[in-house]
């Protein structure tokens, strides 16, 4: 699930909302932001403001916070920790296999071909990759599998509309994260690799119900239907 941050956005608000959506349940939600795309000129600011928000939410040591979760099992713990190998860690990066704790982690200058950028993270690891324009961000997103969710932070409606028009995803939230799944009038689901079909509200009835086709015809006007019935006719003799 990509997250594009416009350099003209209010970064304090953007990073607080990103940190909330990414690190709730230790990143183990299907609509959590998987990575951030931003201009290189704001990467360091994004890191610092994310760190500020994380400390606001979970304190100086998230391991001691009653609100910070743990990884679901040991196998998944090892998988997520393996994604950190060879990466530049700007924050966090530590783990405790005994309690399956992984610290809120931010990665910078990430190689787009590295494993952490090739699969759903589903853990408290947030890579940041730099792009120099909205067009480059869109190109990066469209060259990959279609995500379940896509997020864009921008004060510019044209930026938001362009991102929506030129990408494909299960859902989009602009200037926030995750919350589109809480609006029951909006269908929730994926597209392509992120799954097909959707539910919520009326869409739930349509998705989980079978629309059975039924036709009842009258026993009238048989004379007009003669043309559809075959007639017994002799086979033409060979000539």
Curated annotation (Swiss-Prot):
Q: For this entry, list what GO says about its biological process.
A: aldehyde metabolic process; lipid metabolic process
Per its UniProt record, what Pfam families does this chain match? Answer: Aldedh
Q: Which PROSITE patterns does this one have?
A: ALDEHYDE_DEHYDR_CYS
Which UniProt keywords are listed? Cytoplasm, Lipid metabolism, NADP, Oxidoreductase
Residue positions of the active site: 30
> What EC number(s) does the entry state?
1.2.1.5
| Database matches in Gene3D superfamilies | Aldehyde Dehydrogenase, Chain A, domain 1 (3.40.605.10), Aldehyde Dehydrogenase, Chain A, domain 2 (3.40.309.10)
Q: Domain of life, per the record?
A: Eukaryota
- A cellular component annotation (GO) from this entry: cytoplasm
Q: Subunit structure, briefly?
A: Homodimer.
Q: Which PANTHER family match?
A: ALDEHYDE DEHYDROGENASE, ALDEHYDE DEHYDROGENASE, DIMERIC NADP-PREFERRING
Protein name in the entry? Aldehyde dehydrogenase, dimeric NADP-preferring
Q: What is the lineage of its organism?
A: Eukaryota, Metazoa, Chordata, Craniata, Vertebrata
Gene that this sequence comes from: ALDH3A1
């Amino acid at each position: 699930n990509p997250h594009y941050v416009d350099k003209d956005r209010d970064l304090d608000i953007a990073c607080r909302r990103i940190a909330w959506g990414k690190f709730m349940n230790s990143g183990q939600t299907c609509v959590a932001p998987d990575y951030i795309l931003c201009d290189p000129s704001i990467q360091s600011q994004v890191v610092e403001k994310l760190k500020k928000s994380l400390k606001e939410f979970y304190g100086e040591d998230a391991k001691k916070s009653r609100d910070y979760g743990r990884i679901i099992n040991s196998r998944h713990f090892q998988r997520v920790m393996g994604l950190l190998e060879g990466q530049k860690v700007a924050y966090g990066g530590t783990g405790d296999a005994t309690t399956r704790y992984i610290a809120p982690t931010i990665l910078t200058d990430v190689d787009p071909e590295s494993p952490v950028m090739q699969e759903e993270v589903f853990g408290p690891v947030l890579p940041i990759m730099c792009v120099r324009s909205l067009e480059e961000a869109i190109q990066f997103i469209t060259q990959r599998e279609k995500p379940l969710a896509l997020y864009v932070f921008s004060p510019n409606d044209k930026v938001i509309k362009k991102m929506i028009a030129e990408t494909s995803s299960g859902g989009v939230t602009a200037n926030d994260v995750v919350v589109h799944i809480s609006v029951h009038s909006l269908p929730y689901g994926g597209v392509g690799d992120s799954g097909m079909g959707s539910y919520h509200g009326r869409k739930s009835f349509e998705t989980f119900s079978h629309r059975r086709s039924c036709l009842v015809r009258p026993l009238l006007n048989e004379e007009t239907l003669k043309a559809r019935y075959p007639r017994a006719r002799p086979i033409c003799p060979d000539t």
